[in-house]
Structure formats: structure tokens, C-alpha cells
A protein has these predicted regions:
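Glycine-rich phosphate-binding loop signature in dinucleotide/nucleotide-binding domains
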Residues: 4-6, 107-110, 161-167, 223-227
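Short acidic-hydrophobic, aromatic-tinged amphipathic segments that line or gate anion-handling sites
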Residues: 208-212
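Active-site neighborhood of HAD-like aspartate-dependent phosphohydrolases
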Residues: 2-47
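Substrate-recognition "cap/lid" segment bordering the active-site pocket of phosphatases
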Residues: 91, 113, 119-170, 175-184, ...
Length: 229
């Protein structure tokens, strides 16, 4: 690798709302799962928590409701959500420019990985959707002790591609991605493709905010990725 390439940052990508257009399928899936255990909740409140670990997600929502669930219902929720998401998954598509962005980074020999709060059961099919090779560094909730907003996912992803987290850029669509990036010691980039507003992402610590992967690809120079000579 050339000196120029070695100076470029590595990239750690969130998945849902960052590379694939799946946030609202997750929102509806969580609503259906919650309804099956007797909890009715407005979808906008669910959306605000997408991207958190499942455990924190449930804890936060129940606190807002002032409700309680028995242990059996709490244990059932992840499976109910996964089943509901699988029903809605046929409507999921790659976000504009996601495959092209990853291909550009690979062509320029810039390391990248994917780190998602989703479990392998729900996140795994995205590999095929994005056309990823089998050896793509792909870290799911199953592989770490704590998911976002804890930094474990991004720290593990950085280890997978043998880069210092301080020389990595986290790309995500939610405030939870950006909080995890800050806690990990990485620079955060926000995307609007998951439904959060520009000001929210900037307030959460984003260095830059772009519309979607295509927009980021068109502005890679702004985050230290130079064009080939």
C-alpha cells in the first residue's frame, strides 16, 4: 500500500439506515412484536430508539410508557421482532450509492467493515442484498457483549480490519451510532437516510452530515480520502 493510501482513514459502517433502507421495516416489526406482548406504542417513539441494543431499546420504551413486562415477555421480544422483520424484509433495498461507495473504498485499498446492533438472524441477509463477498468484515450484536451506544461493535470491527480506532471514521444514521463512535474514539459521519435530522446528528457529534451513501461517495475528499493520482 502506498504512503498516500496508508494515510487515508478506515471506514466502519452501520447497516440499517446507513447501507440498506430498512429502518422503517424495523420500526413496524418492533411495533408488531410489542403488540404481541400487550404493549401499544406510536411508531415515532419506536423510531427514536432504532439503532440501540435490543435490551436498552426495550428498557427505554417501557420507561417512557411507565409500563412493566414480565421476564417471559422480555425474553420473547427479540424473537418476535426477528420474525416480524423477516416478513417485511422483502421490501428492503440497498440505499442509493451503498454498493458503489464500498466498491470505491475497496478500489482505493481503504479498509472498511460493517458493525450493526442487529443480530446475525436479521442482519445476515444484507450481505447478499449488498453483494458482499463472504470474507467481508461483518460484526453483529451476537459477537460483542454490549451493542450501541456502547463502543464494542466499532472497536471489534476496527480490530477485524487491523486499524487503530483513532484512524477510523464511523458512518451511521442515528444518534446512537455517533455516541458509540465518540465513546470508541473515532470520528463520526452522519447520514440522513435513517430519518434523523441534520441538526440532531450534528448535535450528537457528527463531523459531517450527508444525505446518503451516494452523497458521501461524492464528498470523500472532505473526510480525507483523496482521488487516485
Amino acid at each position: 500500500m502506498s504512503e498516500r493510501q496508508s494515510l487515508a482513514p478506515a471506514f466502519l459502517f452501520d447497516l440499517d439506515g446507513t447501507l440498506i433502507d430498512s429502518v422503517y421495516q424495523h420500526v413496524v416489526a418492533w411495533r408488531e412484536a410489542l403488540e404481541q406482548v400487550g404493549v401499544s406504542l406510536a411508531v415515532w417513539k419506536i423510531h427514536r430508539r432504532i439503532g440501540m441494543s435490543g435490551g436498552l431499546f426495550v428498557t427505554a420504551l417501557l420507561r417512557e410508557l411507565g409500563a412493566a413486562l414480565d421476564e417471559e415477555a422480555i425474553v420473547r421480544l427479540p424473537g418476535l421482532h426477528a420474525e416480524a422483520y423477516a416478513r417485511h424484509y422483502p421490501g428492503v433495498r440497498p440505499l442509493p450509492g451503498s454498493a458503489e461507495l464500498l466498491a470505491t473504498l475497496s478500489e482505493r485499498e481503504i479498509p472498511w467493515a460493517i458493525a450493526t446492533s442487529g443480530a446475525e438472524r436479521s442482519a445476515g441477509p444484507a450481505r447478499e442484498l449488498l453483494g458482499l463477498p463472504p470474507d467481508t468484515p461483518f460484526v453483529t450484536r451476537d459477537l460483542v457483549r454490549y451493542a450501541k451506544p456502547d463502543p464494542d461493535l466499532f472497536l471489534t470491527a476496527a480490530e477485524r480490519i487491523h486499524v487503530d480506532i483513532r484512524n477510523a471514521i464511523v458512518v451511521g444514521d442515528s444518534v446512537w451510532d455517533l455516541l458509540a463512535a465518540r465513546r470508541a474514539g473515532a470520528l463520526g459521519i452522519g447520514l440522513l437516510s435513517g430519518g434523523y435530522g441534520r441538526e440532531e446528528l450534528l448535535y450528537a457529534g457528527a463531523f459531517r452530515v450527508y444525505e446518503d451513501p451516494a452523497d458521501l461517495r461524492n464528498h470523500l475528499d472532505e473526510v480525507g480520502v483523496r482521488r487516485p493520482l
